[in-house]
Design a protein with these regions (language model features):
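Conserved catalytic core of sirtuin-type NAD+-dependent deacylases
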Residues: 1-218
Length: 219
């Protein structure tokens, strides 16, 4: 492991256009569960399968049940950026890392100080009225009734990409552009099981594609 860490450090030192592509495993030390591990979100008991709840059809059919799940499982009180988030932000400040492409919706990369973050699946910290488009923060909707509603009467929806919904085109294009231009692509905290997001690494054209464990990343 020491040899792998030293090689990773060496490549980082030699690179000046690094992109990090990450998933839920990056945030587990912050107390946020991943999805597919033994203790992950998809293996926890709930009234409906999480994959069903996290779908556009279910949100429209039963927003009250969706928000019960959202408040209890997706919004984790007290979650703070961990050493991995902070290290990536540091690499950006050093001029090494040009972008973070994340499948996470927890906003921890931004809170750690990273500026150029592409949140493929959105963020729980952005919420909009489905009727008039008014913006609401995560704190706003947590203080509302079970189904948050706008002053206009419309249902407020988190800016989270649910099953049956497409990725934001601008976010997707930005992520692809950075991955294509990268001289080093670090992949961590993801099983690469969710498409189309997982397919983005196929756009990498360099020869330094580095899958890392959490231990490597925080070193």
């Amino acid at each position: 492991m020491d040899e792998k860490i030293e090689k990773l450090k060496s490549w980082i030192a030699e690179s000046d256009n690094i992109v990090f592509f990450g998933g839920a495993g990056v945030s587990t030390e912050s107390g946020i569960p991943d999805f597919r591990s033994v203790d992950g979100l998809y293996n926890q008991k709930w009234r409906y399968p999480p994959e069903t709840i996290l779908s556009h059809t279910f949100f429209e059919r039963d927003p009250e049940e969706y928000y019960r799940f959202h408040h209890e499982k997706l919004v984790i009180d007290g979650a703070k950026p961990n050493r991995a988030h902070l290290r990536l932000a540091e690499l950006e400040r050093e001029g090494k890392l040009t972008a973070v492409v994340t499948q996470n919706i927890d906003g921890l990369h931004t809170r750690a100080g990273s500026k150029n973050v592409y949140e493929l699946h959105g963020s729980i910290y952005r919420n909009h009225c489905m009727n008039c488009g008014k913006f609401y923060s995560a704190e706003d909707i947590m203080d509302m009734d079970t189904v948050p509603r706008c002053s206009c009467g419309g249902v407020i929806k988190p800016d989270v990409v649910l099953y049956e919904e497409g990725l934001d085109g601008d976010v997707l294009q930005g992520a692809v552009t950075h991955i294509m231009r990268a001289d080093m692509l670090i992949v961590g905290g993801t099983s690469l099981a969710v498409y189309p997001a997982a397919g983005l690494i196929d756009y990498y054209r360099g020869n330094r594609l580095v899958p890392v464990s959490y231990t490597h990343l925080r070193a």
